[in-house]
UniProtKB/Swiss-Prot annotation:
Substrate binds at D28, H106, Y128, A129, N130. Its EC number is 5.4.99.62. Pathway: Carbohydrate metabolism; D-ribose degradation; D-ribose 5-phosphate from beta-D-ribopyranose: step 1/2. It holds the Pfam family RbsD_FucU. This is D-ribose pyranase. The lineage of its organism: Bacteria, Pseudomonadati, Pseudomonadota, Gammaproteobacteria, Pasteurellales. The gene is rbsD.
Length: 139
């Protein structure tokens, strides 16, 4: 049995197969996921698992180079936004790199998400709780 945080086999597989600049989406329960993107559906019920909890587990195993979020999160979901930025700041310190965060309109976010290797659907029921994480290399 694995001894790291991430126990979900499918999600662990997708993270392990990411190459430089490949992306992974972590999204709330309502984001439309393209049929061309592999889906890892973790949602059990409203709020379970939560978006931030899922992000923290994923970034414990993924080297992140940069991230994309919808502009709307700043106004419509400031608590999630601030906690997300805090998690990314801590990850930057751990990894020894600067993780750039790009803000785009939600409609553009949906287009970009359709280019990801996989999308992780959480049980999050708050608006714009979505992020695209782009894989970097730890060297």
């Amino acid at each position: 049995m694995k001894k790291t945080k991430l126990l979900n086999a499918s999600l662990s597989h997708y993270i392990a197969t990411l190459g430089h600049t490949d992306s992974l989406v972590i999204c709330d329960a309502g984001l439309p996921i393209s049929n061309q993107v592999e889906r890892v559906d973790l949602a059990l019920e409203a709020g379970v698992p939560g978006f931030l909890q899922t992000v923290d587990v994923v970034i414990s195993e993924m080297f992140v180079e940069h991230a994309v979020v919808a502009k709307e999160i700043r106004e419509k979901n400031p608590q999630i936004h601030d906690a997300l930025l805090d998690s990314l700041r801590k990850l930057s310190e751990q990894q020894g790199n600067c993780i750039a965060v790009e803000y785009v309109e939600h409609e553009e976010f949906k287009v970009l998400s359709s280019e990801s290797k996989a999308a992780v659907r959480t049980g999050e029921f708050s608006p714009y709780a979505n992020i695209i994480l782009y894989s970097g290399v730890p060297f």
